[in-house]
A protein has these predicted regions:
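ATP-dependent adenylate-handling active sites, centered on carboxylate activation for C-N bond formation
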Residues: 1-142
Length: 142
């Protein structure tokens, strides 16, 4: 049932045949990518690495894309302009919290590569399934 719900949402919200997916290789991005795949969409999956160093996310994203035959696009995020990038996020994009700046920073470099009209992202399962820092602290002794 949940599969059908997610597939229907992807079908309604991303009607084009070719879509971009922000791919981490984790449960969220794989779920939304699988839904698009079932709809026979062409997937262009974008992930990033920082300063030429692969992360677990970029490694798992590449493996998933190879396995399913999705297009894989690895974007290298430089760190040589990080101070200006952070000020851009704060001033231009009005990021207020440290986590907003940290999580948004790579997308200054990823988004210019995306040409598709529709971009699929994960569903924030961390918040729903209790794997956030707050949930881990709260349920530490249960």
């Amino acid at each position: 049932m949940i599969d059908k719900i997610i597939t229907n949402i992807v079908d309604q919200e991303a009607p084009d045949q070719t879509v971009a997916v922000l791919m981490s290789g984790g449960t969220d991005s794989l779920t939304v990518a699988a839904a698009a795949h079932r709809l026979n969409k062409k997937l262009n999956c974008y992930t990033f690495r920082v300063d030429g160093k692969d992360s677990d996310d970029s490694i798992y994203a590449e493996k998933a894309c190879k396995h399913f035959g999705w297009n894989f696009k690895l974007i290298d995020v430089p760190v040589n302009n990080i101070e200006n990038d952070f000020f851009t996020l704060i001033k231009k994009y009005e990021c207020k919290k440290k986590t907003h700046v940290e999580c948004t920073f790579p997308f200054l470099y990823v988004y210019p590569h995306i040409k598709e009209k529709y971009i699929l992202t994960g569903w924030a399962a961390d918040g729903y399934y209790g794997v956030s820092k707050r949930a881990n602290i709260h349920f530490k002794h249960t």
